[in-house]
């Protein structure tokens, strides 16, 4: 029998007869964030009617009205059986067009959910918040799994903002007020605690990272940074560098500053009490090319 609206449910199955190309593409485009597990197979009924047979196990309860907004023509019912039962039923004809997450074993829902979150590339802080008990028991193992498979290598140009000016003018405050999660890199080799934050802040910088390392950090190619006992992918979208000194003075004369300047996206200067973006033609070398 079709489900009544009720208070919502996490586990739903559905049938969608004669699916259109648009409906099939929509199903294929679904992402992992909302689901513990999902599977959709393409089948033909006894009368030859093509249809989609699907199963959704959401992380949060969903009402029928919300599901109808996703697939208005589908017939939804509250699911019976386990994830494994529904996996078998929806894949019986072998033409599976969507699978998300992993099938949970009985009594291990939280653990399997945490593993699935790590496998999908979620940040460890997010995994710890969503599965705190699992993290307390298996945090080291989840971290090791994340190091092996969790993060995809960088495939984009990390933006680099340089802001310099006299002490006490507000550079650090400006960096802290920028949007996104932040990792403050301390002096030294290690990046312990780095979890792919949106922004890396190099505060009060004057060349205390090796020049070749700075070039790699500020570039667009895959790069790993060291944590105790391992290396992790550097995936931050933005680097903010604050300094009392202009960037052309950070490194010795035998380090050509031009490659580093080329990686800068924007350069800022505190003029008295006003922050101004420096015009590229006023800088010692060209930037952002």
UniProtKB/Swiss-Prot annotation:
RCR-3 (motif): residue ranges: 89-92
Q: Which UniProt keywords apply?
A: ATP-binding, Covalent protein-DNA linkage, DNA replication, DNA-binding, Endonuclease, Helicase, Host nucleus, Hydrolase, Metal-binding, Multifunctional enzyme, Nuclease, Nucleotide-binding, Nucleotidyltransferase, Transferase
Q: Where is the CRESS-DNA virus Rep endonuclease domain positioned along the sequence?
A: 6-103
The record's annotation in Gene3D superfamilies points to: 3.40.1310.20
Motif RCR-1: which ranges? 13-16
The record's comment on cofactor binding reads: Divalent metal cations, possibly Mg(2+) or Mn(2+).
Q: Which residues bind a divalent metal cation?
A: 43, 51, 93
**Sequence motif RCR-2, residues:** 51-53
Q: What is its EC number?
A: 2.7.7.-, 3.1.21.-, 3.6.1.-
Q: Name one Pfam family in it.
A: RNA_helicase
State any GO CC term: host cell nucleus
Q: Which cofactor does it need?
A: Mg(2+); Mn(2+)
What is this enzyme's catalytic activity, as reactions?
A: ATP + H2O = ADP + phosphate + H(+)
Residues binding ATP, per UniProt: 165-172
Origin superkingdom? Viruses
Q: What does this protein do?
A: Essential for the replication of viral ssDNA. The closed circular ssDNA genome is first converted to a superhelical dsDNA. Rep and/or Rep' binds a specific hairpin at the genome origin of replication. Introduces an endonucleolytic nick within the conserved sequence 5'-AGTATTAC-3' in the intergenic region of the genome, thereby initiating the rolling circle replication (RCR). Following cleavage, binds covalently to the 5'-phosphate of DNA as a tyrosyl ester. The cleavage gives rise to a free 3'-OH that serves as a primer for the cellular DNA polymerase.
**Per its record, how is this protein called by name?**
Replication-associated protein
Report the source organism. Answer: Beak and feather disease virus
């Amino acid at each position: 029998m079709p489900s009544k609206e009720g208070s919502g449910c996490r586990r739903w199955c559905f049938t969608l007869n004669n699916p259109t190309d648009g409906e099939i593409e929509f199903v294929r485009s679904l992402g992992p964030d909302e689901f513990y597990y999902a599977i959709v197979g393409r089948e033909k009924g006894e009368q030859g009617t093509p249809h989609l047979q699907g199963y959704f196990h959401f992380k949060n309860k969903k009402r029928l009205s919300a599901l109808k907004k996703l697939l208005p023509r589908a017939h939804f019912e509250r699911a019976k059986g386990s994830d494994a039962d529904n996996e078998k039923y929806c894949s019986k004809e072998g033409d599976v067009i969507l699978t998300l997450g992993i099938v949970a074993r009985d009594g291990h829902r939280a653990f399997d959910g945490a593993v699935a979150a790590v496998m999908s590339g979620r940040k460890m802080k997010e995994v710890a918040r969503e599965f705190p008990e699992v993290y307390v028991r298996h945090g080291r193992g989840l971290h090791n799994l994340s190091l092996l498979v969790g993060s995809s290598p960088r495939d984009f140009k990390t933006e680099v903002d340089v802001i310099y000016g006299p002490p006490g003018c507000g550079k650090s405050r400006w960096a802290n007020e920028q949007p996104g999660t932040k990792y403050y890199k301390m002096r030294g080799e290690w990046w312990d605690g780095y979890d792919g934050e949106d922004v890396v802040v190099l505060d009060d910088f004057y060349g205390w990272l090796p020049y070749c390392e700075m070039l790699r950090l500020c570039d667009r190619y895959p790069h790993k940074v060291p944590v105790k006992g391992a290396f992790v992918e550097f995936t931050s979208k933005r680097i903010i560098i604050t300094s009392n000194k202009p960037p052309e003075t950070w490194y010795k004369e035998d380090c050509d500053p031009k490659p580093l300047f080329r990686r800068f996206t924007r350069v800022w200067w505190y003029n008295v009490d006003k922050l101004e973006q420096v015009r590229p033609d006023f800088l010692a070398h060209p930037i952002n090319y």
